[in-house]
């Protein structure tokens, strides 16, 4: 049984995503610092933050709701990385998209587990 949200693979992968997004956006054009960079970093930070907040809730239903919020933020990050690539701010986000897909599967599994009452 997991005793702390930091033990959750979903949270750990979410933290990896945050580090990756911050590294990727470090060299974005200055004009994008309050546009795409801000949106990307906020969405990325939202993934592990929502997992942690959900873990602190008292019911599996509430926890599942926050994990679903994290999943929504994950899809935001994916879309924004594709936009960044299309605009020429990053070269290739294929590996990042694959990591996002893996984390999405982990989040889906966690949601299913919580809904079934095994969270």
Region locations from a protein language model:
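Amphipathic alpha-helical assembly/interaction segments
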Residues: 1-119
């Amino acid at each position: 049984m997991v005793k702390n949200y930091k033990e959750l693979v979903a949270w750990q992968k979410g933290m990896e995503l945050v580090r990756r997004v911050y590294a990727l956006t470090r060299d974005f054009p200055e004009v994008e610092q309050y546009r795409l960079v801000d949106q990307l970093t906020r969405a990325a930070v939202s993934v592990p933050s929502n997992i942690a907040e959900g873990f602190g809730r008292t019911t599996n239903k509430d926890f599942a709701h926050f994990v679903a919020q994290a999943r929504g933020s994950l899809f935001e990050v994916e879309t924004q990385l594709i936009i960044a690539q299309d605009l020429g701010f990053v070269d290739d986000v294929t590996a990042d998209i694959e990591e996002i897909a893996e984390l999405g599967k982990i989040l889906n599994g966690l949601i299913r587990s919580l809904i079934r009452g095994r969270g």
